[in-house]
């Protein structure tokens, strides 16, 4: 079958003829329709230090997708041939304390689709049926293909009550922008997002952010004054992984504020812990999506009128994959879809 795989320990990704995946007793086989390029895929493409230490070569990559069930393992219940599905990319062990307590997003033995096992950038994908999520008929293939990163945004944004609150989001990548849209949709008062990429800040404005701030040109404090905010932000969503952005967030938080962190710093981060202590801040780390509460919330948000369509800015056929990766790497895009 046709696939996109990491075949060499160097920058790049290659179109490859891979073997069909096997289907176990508890698995389903999915014929892929659309996939989306993730930041993780870009790390693997660029073959950075994390990728070199994590990704076995060769490896079919990719974990954002939508497709159709074409084969079902003999022990599988609840799925039928023809079901349209996306899926949770974190394969959990099922036997650790957190898994057994229903907190599978905190499994200490997680295996990643397209990272530790064969991924979705292929004509077919086999995953445990437990990890598949049926897509409602009134949600498009395009939106279903980005449910994985949308789930990161939803998990982060809905970690704390946002109704009537002032929200600061640092990092206007696709996930940060979707988090801004979610915060606005569920009733936040002011949603302010920061970055230095004008293309993505403009996209954030289109997605409903109250203010999209280029911190290289504009003071966040001035923006707060313009909005009549005298006490600081109630909720912070750190999506950038940039130490300076996190420190600025802590400085601008109100006393008793709550911070959810999804962005991954490249190294150690120096923090003024006095601000955390004396402001009484709560900081929560976010990894992946809650299984499967986040997934049901995603579908409900879209069915309830949340418009994510503007975040999908480019589409390419799979034979044009190089153009897709170049576009994603340019920083001048939202989500990039590859059609199979």
Swiss-Prot record:
Root EC class: oxidoreductase
Cofactor(s) for this UniProt protein: Zn(2+)
InterPro entries: ADH-like_C, ADH-like_N, ADH_Zn_CS, GroES-like_sf, L-Threonine_3-DHase, NAD(P)-bd_dom_sf, PKS_ER, Zn_alcohol_dh
Subcellular location: Cytoplasm
Site (Important for catalytic activity for the proton relay mechanism but does not participate directly in the coordination of zinc atom): 148
UniProt binding sites for Zn(2+) 2: 93, 96, 99, 107
Pathway: Amino-acid degradation; L-threonine degradation via oxydo-reductase pathway; glycine from L-threonine: step 1/2
Keyword Oxidoreductase: yes
UniProtKB keywords: Cytoplasm, Metal-binding, NAD, Oxidoreductase, Zinc
List of residues binding NAD(+): 175, 195, 200, 262-264, 286-287
Record-listed Zn(2+) 1 binding positions: 38, 63-64
GO BP terms in the entry: L-threonine catabolic process to glycine
Superkingdom of origin: Bacteria
Quaternary structure (record): Homotetramer.
Family recorded in the similarity comment: Belongs to the zinc-containing alcohol dehydrogenase family.
Role this protein plays: Catalyzes the NAD(+)-dependent oxidation of L-threonine to 2-amino-3-ketobutyrate.
Protein name in UniProt: L-threonine 3-dehydrogenase
Annotated source species: Pseudoalteromonas atlantica (strain T6c / ATCC BAA-1087)
Gene responsible for this protein: tdh
